[in-house]
Amino acid sequence: MLDVSVPKDSFKLIKNLGEKYPSLKTLFEEIDSNLNQNLWYQLSENLISISNKPELPNSKDLIQLYNGLVLFIEPTLNPMKYLEFVQNMLHNYKDKMEEALVFVENIERKNAQKYKGEEKIFIKIIKGFCFLELNKMYELEEVVKNTEQDFSGNIEIDSSLYSQYYKLSTLYYEKKEDYDNFYNNAFQYLAYETKYQTKIN
């Protein structure tokens, strides 16, 4: 089992966020409890739930939660759950997408040897959404084409990743006004998103 050191300030942050968001207080209390008991799987699920709440993307609190907690426990988390939290956290950057891109590229560089298969594809897709927001069409095109090649060589890929990819490629082709590919990818996105939602419900 990995040994991680969580500073006392992390627990203070969790308590403060629970007080700031009364409707989420129970969830923050679960985070505190699971953290104290080293229940990493449950904790990763808690963090995803928090990052999906509509209250937090409109603030800087996900960034604060990342810097004050997630950064310390990242080695214990499932890499895909960690990346899902990172993707949701990027909503906090809003008009600072250049900073978000640098942040994501640093994660990619740090984990170059660790990320294989799904993780490698997911971080590439997250970068693609940054390129989309920054209107960096050449870089986005590279992500779309390279990720499509990645899929062709892998049959064991979760439907959620296909959903993410086809959402990205649909938005890419819409920007290019390539409507044939736009509609083809949009249909694929809807199919995989429906499959993913059915799986988790």
What are these regions (language model features)?
Residues M1-N201:
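Extended alpha-helical scaffold regions
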